[in-house]
UniProtKB/Swiss-Prot annotation:
<keyword id="KW-0238">DNA-binding</keyword>
<keyword id="KW-0234">DNA repair</keyword>
<keyword id="KW-0347">Helicase</keyword>
<keyword id="KW-0378">Hydrolase</keyword>
<dbReference type="Pfam" id="PF12705">
    <property type="entry name" value="PDDEXK_1"/>
</dbReference>
<dbReference type="InterPro" id="IPR014141">
    <property type="entry name" value="DNA_helicase_suRexB"/>
</dbReference>
<keyword id="KW-0067">ATP-binding</keyword>
<keyword id="KW-0547">Nucleotide-binding</keyword>
<dbReference type="InterPro" id="IPR038726">
    <property type="entry name" value="PDDEXK_AddAB-type"/>
</dbReference>
<dbReference type="InterPro" id="IPR049035">
    <property type="entry name" value="ADDB_N"/>
</dbReference>
<keyword id="KW-0540">Nuclease</keyword>
<dbReference type="GO" id="GO:0016817">
    <property type="term" value="F:hydrolase activity, acting on acid anhydrides"/>
</dbReference>
<dbReference type="GO" id="GO:0004386">
    <property type="term" value="F:helicase activity"/>
</dbReference>
<dbReference type="Pfam" id="PF21445">
    <property type="entry name" value="ADDB_N"/>
</dbReference>
<dbReference type="GO" id="GO:0008409">
    <property type="term" value="F:5'-3' exonuclease activity"/>
</dbReference>
<comment type="function">
    <text>The heterodimer acts as both an ATP-dependent DNA helicase and an ATP-dependent, dual-direction single-stranded exonuclease. Recognizes the chi site generating a DNA molecule suitable for the initiation of homologous recombination. This subunit has 5' -&gt; 3' nuclease activity but not helicase activity.</text>
</comment>
<keyword id="KW-0269">Exonuclease</keyword>
Length: 1161
């Protein structure tokens, strides 16, 4: 018998050496049997390669994969089955099985018995953490109860192990009919003495370490060998990377783990040094030597060249993968002998790339196998189960959408299910119906009265409403059926049966089967996982009292722990994998992506219940007890093995290696080069340099490096042509168009100008009518962005209504309370300033109570949250009324009209009550009629000479003369025109001012309060009685002494408290104020008329350019627009802002500019 260890560095060809040895024994011993053992992950590729190479030694065709009865290639688990010829009859225990039992135990245990875990035991994820920790302990060959006496201290670790042992003792009896995943190996180890292993030889390749169960099997084989059970001529040979001599860095040594394995388990074996060298390129041979020297002695013996190795950096991850895909495709084209299966793409973690790689590799038509598990928790079946069981609110919007958007529940035979669901979603977002509404009311997305004629539009509207109500009834039936059946469930056996029957009754299993028939088997995999979980629940806790919360958590844990199985890369595909996964070592080319300091080496953190500090204690405990330690390593120990993982990963390829990383991370932070590569790039180590890869070719000579498929090249070249001009890609255009006709359209896009065309007159008439009937806000919208005006008022597009208190609803609520309160004062002929604060509060609250009973404001009493919002809005109005009340005490003004409408309205009653509107004749003889509504008109003096226009605003608006000049601030001036026209009907001679009133809905500014020496307890809490004195009316005030005296009497050196004007010490008007002279007012009003007519003329001529106003770098007309996705504003396509910074800001300069323009006209 012979136990041998074959050692060598990663540049050595272990496989050929082992096969030559097998071949020699094969030739001279016809009775010998050979078992070639490799890690499970590379079993298939290794089997093909081993048998092919062995066939070559025998003189067979080197291209055939020979299967010899005397030479078998196995993984350890497959070896156990092959030699015992039996499968474990017990069900393999899963994390889910243990989680189910742990959860049940934790629910039954008194909380005080959980000791250190008493607080965390009820937190999400704790059950899964306990289950994972117990499984780790069991896989090490021990139980928590066996570990407990090894730790002879009364400390935190002892408390943890006691709780784990307590839980363990309660669940193990339930697991007697189950086996651990590695039990087959342990069972095989115990049965070896009974198995005929005569003439058997075992060769292990590719292992850098063994689990506890694997090691038990290895030890059993060695023991059988020593007892000559295998025969005197048999041998067991292990290949082990490294050498024993280079151990000066301890745990940080490159070969530390391999050396520890040799020292602890194979010290009596005969060591055999591999002489065969792998066919590595110069770069790979030099990498092996340089990295080995750096990691074993701290320096390299000489500087080496790396001609087949590159380090490249790209701007971001997408461009990084685009470079990799482009480079791979060019290699495959340039080298006909190179196959896709010869290429490996590696990353430490693929998480940040798993969505990018498929998209870009598909664009380049590259076949690939993504060797990365995808979790099942995002599958629609998981979402369906979790949302059916998870919400107490049966008709909650999110629950409804998550259940019925899965595509697993539908009415049969018709294809309008999704359309109906879309319409229903619009209704739910706008109305948020409660369960009572669902059951008792018909939903109307589009309001239709019984008197409306059944024209085509109304027929469609009725069909939409009917479709919504069909969906409503369908959903009620589905959800009620589920609720009724689960209401009868008393234990988990019934729960399992009920859920399964309900899903099959709804034909969910058939939907998933149909998906599988169409090529997507993920649903079938998820369905099998669900059935497996239900079986485990039924077997383990079927007779326990049912808890829907716990049942839901069991299902969620099951979906979260499961992954979709992929098809191995057995065809001609590029392998995309992670460096922690064992790979074969005969790839021709390696692309190591994300080679940045954030990923390489990997940073690991322990999240298990037994943390790193605990593990260090246990290692010491096991050492003192002279017992082998097979629990997981600490995070630090894992990180010390990173250098060997990097070494092995890079040497997975024989020819070339390309390291790449992106300068910009997904989180927006900057990447730097990996410290591993920085060491390799040192001037005294290698000639490696970092090559920056531009996103686009920088010269015509570079174009060839950016070409791939027709599709990928079209994307690159169109961007290049956009940046450098079409001449830059001259010569390639015709070729690409032949390969991909769509490229012609891409090139045309280079000349695309994203500007709307002028509309034809007939379309204008259909959209806006013969004459224009507009509001002032509509004209302001036109000047703010003409194209958005067209979308909103021409096409009448509007965003989807949502059940929320937005600015429009709160504004309407504010105005309605103001209107009711002021109208009651007008009706009672009560002066505003005669009221007390208490009377104002009573009037406000009575008005608010009247309003929330109206349908328009039903949202404000729909739940506690919105009732609180209503109280807050009412408080805002009350505070504003109090502040206006204080201002009113300084003069004799009194409100005489609220919500004063001017312009033609629909009903006769409204027409009688409204003021005369404004109308102007346009360029082609058509008319523009303006309508509006003035929030409030005050009679400012006892002689009824002056009136003041008041407009409520919730955004602290002030009158901006620059906005008035460009047309986005026309409201106050147009109101002034309307009131001047209607002054006799109102009861005043003329308007004297037009001002905005800010509704006080801003939180108190603490810093401003302190600056005004106001104590904080006057701003917050029960004593909040004093407001920061910054309340003022802002707008336009006529510079007339009689008018100003009726606002507030101001002496020299004083400023008006509530209006923006004052006097200097010399009695002159202050420069910065809202005052305008009569002459300047005339200019402003004429300019206002001009802008109104100008907008009308442009509208009737169909001019709606995409030309949004831009006030500053932070704010433009697009900042809060609902139409940005339609407009696609892009300066690259010729779009420009109407930048206000090019106009003067000074009031006098702007009025002079208006006067000049008026003179020109």
């Amino acid at each position: 018998m012979t136990l041998e260890i074959v050692r060598g560095f990663a540049d050595r060809d272990f496989r050929s050496e082992l096969l030559e040895r097998i071949y020699e024994k094969y030739r001279i011993d016809p009775q010998a049997r050979f078992f070639y053992i490799v890690p499970n992950h590379i079993k298939f590729s290794a089997e093909v390669d081993v048998l092919k190479k062995f066939g070559s030694l025998l003189g067979k065709n080197d291209q055939e994969a020979q299967a010899f009865s005397r030479l078998q290639v196995y993984s350890l688990s497959r070896l156990a089955w092959a030699l015992t010829k039996e499968r474990d009859q017990k069900t393999i225990i899963s994390n889910q099985s243990v989680s189910i039992l742990v959860g049940q135990v934790l629910r039954e245990l008194p909380i005080e018995k959980l000791n250190i875990f008493a607080r965390s035991a009820r937190m999400p994820g704790f059950v899964a953490n306990v289950a994972e920790q117990l499984l780790e302990i069991w896989r090490s060959g021990l139980t928590a109860s066996e570990i407990l006496p090894l730790h002879q201290f009364d400390d935190r670790l002892s408390e943890k192990i006691k709780v784990l042992a307590l839980i363990e003792t309660k669940i193990l009896p339930s697991l007697k009919d189950y086996s651990l995943p590695d039990d087959a190996l342990r069972n095989f180890a115990t049965q070896i003495s009974k198995i005929d292993l005569k003439n058997c030889n075992f060769y292990f390749e590719g292992f850098s370490g063994f689990t506890a169960s694997e090691l038990s099997l290895v030890k059993a084989l060695i023991s059988a060998d020593r007892k000559t059970q295998l025969g005197k001529k048999s041998e067991i040979v292990f290949s082990l990377t490294g050498e024993q001599q280079s151990d000066q860095y301890g745990e940080g040594n490159l070969f530390y783990r391999a050396n520890q394995l040799f020292k602890n388990e194979f010290s009596s074996a005969r060591v055999w040094i591999v002489s065969n060298i792998r066919p590595l390129s110069e770069s790979q041979l030099n990498f092996e030597q340089s990295w080995r020297e750096l990691e074993t002695q701290g320096f390299t013996s000489q500087k080496r060249s790396f001609p087949q190795t590159k380090i490249v950096v790209s701007s971001d991850q997408e461009h990084e993968i685009d470079f990799v895909a482009r480079s791979i495709r060019q290699r495959l084209v340039d080298n006909p002998k190179l196959r896709a299966k010869d290429i490996l793409v590696l990353a430490q973690r693929l998480d940040g790339y798993k969505n990018i790689i498929p998209k870009i590799f598909d664009r380049y038509d590259l076949p690939y196998f993504l060797d990365k598990d995808t979790r099942m928790s995002d599958h629609p079946l998981a979402s369906l189960a979790e949302n059916l069981l998870g919400s107490s609110n049966e008709f909650a919007y999110e629950r409804i959408m998550k259940i019925f958007r899965t595509g697993l529940l539908s009415w049969q035979l018709e294809d309008n299910f999704q359309t109906a669901l879309d319409y229903l979603e619009n209704y739910l977002l706008a109305n948020n119906p409660k369960e009572k509404n669902w059951r008792q009311e018909e939903f109307q997305l589009i309001q239709i009265s019984d008197e409306q004629d059944l024209n085509d539009d109304h027929k469609i509207d009725r069909q939409i409403n009917a479709l919504i109500n069909r969906m409503r009834l369908f959903i009620i039936k589905i959800l009620d059926d589920f609720q009724e059946k689960f209401a009868k469930v008393e234990n988990y056996h019934q729960a399992v049966k009920t859920l399964y029957n309900w899903l099959t009754d709804q034909q969910v299993d058939q939907v998933l089967l149909n998906q599988a028939n169409d090529g997507d088997d993920r649903g079938q995999q998820t369905w099998k996982l669900l059935l497996s979980t239900l079986d485990e629940v039924d077997q383990l806790i079927g007779d326990k009292k049912y808890s829907q919360k716990d049942f839901l958590q069991i299902l969620k844990d099951g979906f979260a722990a499961a992954s979709f199985s992929g098809i191995p890369a057995s065809l001609d595909q590029i392998t995309v994998s992670e460096s922690g996964i064992v790979q074969r070592n005969d790839f021709k080319a390696l692309y190591f992506i994300d080679a940045s300091d954030a990923s390489l080496p990997a940073q690991t953190n322990s999240s298990s219940l037994i943390d790193d500090f605990d593990r260090l204690q246990l290692i010491d405990d096991f050492s003192k007890a002279q017992k082998p330690y097979y629990l997981q390593d600490t995070s630090r120990q894992e990180m010390t093995a990173e250098n060997f993982r990097f070494y092995s990963s890079v040497l997975s390829a024989t020819d070339s290696v390309t390291f790449s990383y992106s300068k910009l991370r997904l989180d927006g932070k900057q990447n730097e080069l990996s410290p591993y590569l920085r060491r390799l790039s040192l001037k005294n180590v290698s000639d490696l340099k970092i090559e920056k890869i531009p996103d686009l070719p920088q010269s015509q000579a570079d174009l060839v490096d950016y070409l791939g498929t027709a599709n990928s090249s079209a994307a690159i070249l169109s961007q290049t042509a956009q940046n450098f001009g079409e001449d830059f890609i001259d010569g390639l255009t015709d070729l690409l168009i032949k390969r991909n006709p769509y490229f012609q359209r891409i090139l045309q896009a280079l000349h695309y100008n994203n500007q709307p065309v002028t509309l034809r007159p007939e379309l204008i008439k259909k959209l806006f009518g013969e004459d224009l009937r507009l509001s002032i806000s509509q004209i302001e919208k036109y000047y703010s962005n003409p194209y958005e005006y067209f979308l909103q008022y021409g096409l009448r597009l509007k965003k989807r209504n949502q059940f929320t208190v937005d600015a429009a609803l709160s504004g309407t609520y504010y105005h309605s309370i103001f209107e009711q309160v002021i109208n009651r004062l007008i009706g009672k002929r009560t002066d505003f300033h005669d009221l007390s604060d208490q009377e104002l509060k009573k009037l406000s609250q009575e008005s608010a109570q009247n309003l929330i009973e109206l349908p328009d404001f039903q949202i404000l009493q729909s739940d506690d949250h919105f009732r609180a919002v209503a109280r807050s809005l009412t408080d805002d109005v009350l505070l504003t009324l109090k502040l206006m009340h204080r201002a009113n005490r300084l003069n004799n003004s009194r409100p005489i009209k609220t919500e004063a409408v001017f312009g033609k309205l629909s009903s006769d009653q409204q027409r009688e009550q409204s003021l005369s509107g404004l109308d102007f004749t346009l360029a082609n003889g058509r008319k523009i009629y303006l309508r509006g509504k003035v929030d409030r008109i005050d009679q400012q003096d006892l002689e009824h000479i002056f009136g003041t226009i008041i407009d409520y605003k919730s955004n602290g608006k002030v009158f901006d003369f620059r906005d008035a000049y460009v047309g986005t601030e026309l409201q106050l001036l147009t109101y002034w025109l309307a009131l001047s026209k209607n002054s006799s009907r109102i009861g005043i001679n003329q308007p004297g001012g037009a001002v905005f009133v800010q509704i006080r809905n801003k939180p108190a500014d603490i810093s401003q309060a302190l600056a005004h020496q106001i104590q904080l307890d006057q701003l917050i809490g029960d004593r909040a009685k004093q407001q920061v004195p910054d309340f003022q009316f802002h707008g336009i005030l006529l510079d007339d002494q009689n008018y100003l005296a009726n606002l507030q009497t101001v002496l020299a050196g004083q400023k008006a408290k509530y209006y923006n004007f004052g006097l200097t010490k010399k009695g002159q008007k202050t420069a910065r104020s809202d005052l305008v002279s009569k002459e300047d007012l005339t200019v402003l009003l004429k300019h206002d008329e001009k802008k109104l007519v100008e907008a009308g003329n442009k509208i009737i001529h169909g001019e709606f350019p995409l030309y949004p106003i831009k006030k500053n770098e932070q704010r433009s007309a697009l900042t809060y627009s609902d139409y940005t996705e339609i407009m696609n504003f892009d300066r690259n396509f010729g779009n420009q802002y109407n930048n206000l910074t090019r106009y003067p800001k000074n009031k006098s300069e702007l009025i002079s500019k208006m006067r000049e323009e008026e003179g020109e006209n």
